Regions:
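A beta-rich soluble binding module of mature secreted/lumenal proteins
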Residues: 15, 20-168
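Bacterial N-terminal signal peptides that target proteins for export
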Residues: 1-11
Length: 168
């Protein structure tokens, strides 16, 4: 066996072991819970992004919004928009479709912006009047606080951040 093949084999085995271990669930963090029910018709419409966990696909975005509309097919059209690097920046838009993944609660969706990749969209907190929502995904890598209005009062935002901390 050549040295290259030997080292490549060790490298490949190490990658397999590391990736296998990374998929083992963390027992210390409880499973993320979604809200008990979402009336999709009330959830549709425009939402403003108030806060988020930073992510690569919104880098440089300012004034982000999400617009949800129901299509005849039953899918939900998702239109995300932001201005790049400030309020007068170039408009950036991403359009995708979402399917309800849990018909019991309507709180778990699968969103697809480009084929074949789909992402989880879990509604983990929702105002009874549908004025704000917290959205995340099972691994807690992404999170957004959304509001029906462009601004949120400081106390409500503080309360929502505390809810997020309590959810782990």
């Amino acid at each position: 066996m050549t040295i290259f093949v030997k080292y490549f084999s060790y490298f490949f085995l190490t990658i397999l072991l590391v990736s296998g271990c990374s998929s083992i669930p963390n027992k210390a963090t409880p499973e993320l819970q979604v809200v008990s029910y979402v009336d999709i018709e009330r959830y549709l419409g425009k939402w403003y992004e108030i806060a988020l966990y930073p992510n690569w696909f919104e880098k440089g975005c300012f004034g982000s919004t999400a617009y949800y509309e129901k299509l005849e097919s039953g899918q939900i059209r998702v239109t995300n928009q932001c201005r790049m690097h400030g309020p007068e920046g170039e408009l950036n838009e991403a359009i995708g479709n979402a399917d309800i993944a849990d018909n019991k609660t309507n709180a778990k969706l699968k969103v697809q912006f480009f084929w074949p990749f789909k992402g989880d969209y879990w509604i983990i907190d929702l105002d009874k009047d549908y004025q704000y929502a917290i959205v995340s995904e099972p691994d807690r890598q992404y999170l957004w606080i959304l509001s029906r209005s462009q601004n949120m009062d400081v106390q409500t935002l503080k309360t929502l951040k505390e809810k997020i901390r309590n959810k782990g």
